[in-house]
Each structure stands twice: as structure tokens, then as C-alpha cells.
């Protein structure tokens, strides 16, 4: 039921009815703003179903405010990951079309796959390509990706792809190292067994599992300074 009537107690100890409406809780996984003239910051807190659309809208806002963007910081710190197709899409927003984003490899034939920066690898059934709304300049704007020990899974896929293709400078601390693929094998009507069946690999073939992504520039998060300094050099 969408509505729920629940009794409550008042401060006088008397009960009274309260109607609770059930609604979907929508969390905002993308934030961003122009930090200073020519430079912007966009943060992804996780990779959800709405993340790609929200990312595109935020980039549109940034370029409307600052059409001559000189540099962008993509902040993936403490982003635990999420959906693989969202990670492929975010990577594709910055990379040339059809280059490799990530691959999986395991002992079984079905665990071997390659995911490229192409709509067929991130579009959902019946949906259009949101990346078509992005300004062409996003493919070449100087880019810094911020990561730390809390960046995992999908975050590491994005950071690894942008690093391997030399599209961005990755800055921060070594990432978590969550690069395994789990598959659930049904055992009965109500039971199943989750097995690790493959690992994720960056475009150059580096395993993400346990090793994570090592930044190009190692930075202590407590250190003073600005990531925009790397964009200006």
C-alpha cells in the first residue's frame, strides 16, 4: 500500500492517527560548481541509475555558466561505486568513441568481456543517449580525477580508464581495490551461492582487485593546495 495509517502518542500520552505516504527516496549523487573563473569541480558520490543523467545536467550547467572552461576536477573520493554501465558512460563522456574502458576475465567463457566507450555498452533499453547533450569541448578539457582509499569499484574503473588513456591526471591516494565480479548461482527456491567469477582490468591490462589505482600524483588529503594547480601546468 502507498499509504499507511500508524497510531502515535502525543506528549499527553493520548494516541492520534498519522498517515504516512510511501515515496521513492531520491538521492543526489552528483554535485558541482564553478570554483573560480575557468575552472569547475564535479563530484560523484556513487554510480546509480540516475547518475549519468544528473552528470550530464551538471556539466550543461557548468558550461552555461563558464563556456570557456579551462579545466575540470572530477571528484571520486569516497565514492564506493555502483553500476557498471554508469561507470562506462562517465568514462565515455571524456574518452574518444569506442576505446576500451574496462574488461573482465575469469576461468569461465562467460566471464570474459570487454566494455568500450560506445552507447551499446551503457544505454538502457528504450532510452536515448544522454551523452549526446554534452558539449564537444568536454572531450579535450584538461582533467584531474581525485581519488582516495574510499574510492572503489566503479570509481576505480573510471579512474583507471582515464589514467590509462592519458586523458586525466589522477591525484590523491591509492584506491580501495574492489575489482572482483560476483555471480549468484541459484541452489533452490530461496537460496543461492555468491561466487567471485572474474576480475576487472583497466585498458592496459592492470588488475584492479586488491591493488586499486595508484595516482599519478600522490597527495595527502590533509595537505594544503589545490588540484587546479595541476590543470594550470
Predicted ranges, named:
Residues 65, 108-109, 126, 194-195, ...:
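Short, intrinsically disordered/low-complexity patches at protein termini
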Residues 1-188:
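Cleft-lining beta-strand/loop regions that shape enzyme active-site pockets
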Residues 147, 197-199:
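Generic secondary-structure microfeatures
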Residues 192, 199-233:
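Conserved functional hotspot residues or short segments at active or partner-binding sites
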Residues 14-16, 38, 189, 194-196, ...:
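A generic structural signal for well-ordered coil/turn residues at beta-strand boundaries
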Amino acid at each position: 500500500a502507498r499509504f499507511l495509517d500508524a497510531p502515535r502518542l502525543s506528549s499527553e500520552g493520548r494516541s492520534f492517527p498519522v498517515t504516512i505516504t510511501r515515496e521513492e527516496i531520491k538521492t543526489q549523487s552528483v554535485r558541482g560548481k564553478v570554483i573560480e573563473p575557468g575552472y569547475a569541480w564535479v563530484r560523484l558520490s556513487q554510480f546509480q541509475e540516475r547518475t549519468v543523467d544528473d552528470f550530464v545536467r551538471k556539466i550543461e550547467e557548468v558550461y552555461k555558466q563558464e563556456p570557456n572552461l579551462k579545466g575540470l576536477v572530477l571528484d571520486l573520493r569516497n565514492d564506493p561505486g555502483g553500476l557498471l554501465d554508469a561507470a562506462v558512460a562517465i568514462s565515455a563522456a571524456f574518452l574518444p568513441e569506442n576505446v576500451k574502458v574496462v574488461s573482465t576475465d575469469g576461468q569461465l567463457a562467460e566471464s570474459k568481456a570487454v566494455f568500450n566507450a560506445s552507447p551499446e555498452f551503457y544505454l538502457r533499453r528504450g532510452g536515448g543517449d544522454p551523452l549526446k547533450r554534452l558539449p564537444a569541448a568536454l572531450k579535450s578539457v584538461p582533467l584531474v580525477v581525485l581519488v582516495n582509499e574510499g574510492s572503489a569499484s566503479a570509481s576505480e574503473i573510471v579512474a583507471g580508464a582515464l589514467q590509462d588513456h592519458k586523458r586525466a591526471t589522477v591525484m590523491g591516494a591509492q584506491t580501495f581495490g574492489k575489482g572482483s565480479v560476483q555471480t549468484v548461482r541459484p541452489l533452490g527456491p530461496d537460496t543461492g551461492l555468491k561466487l567471485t567469477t572474474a576480475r576487472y582490468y583497466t585498458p592496459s591490462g592492470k588488475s584492479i582487485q586488491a591493488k586499486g589505482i595508484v595516482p599519478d600524483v600522490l597527495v595527502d588529503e590533509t595537505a594544503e593546495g589545490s588540484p587546479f594547480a595541476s590543470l594550470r601546468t
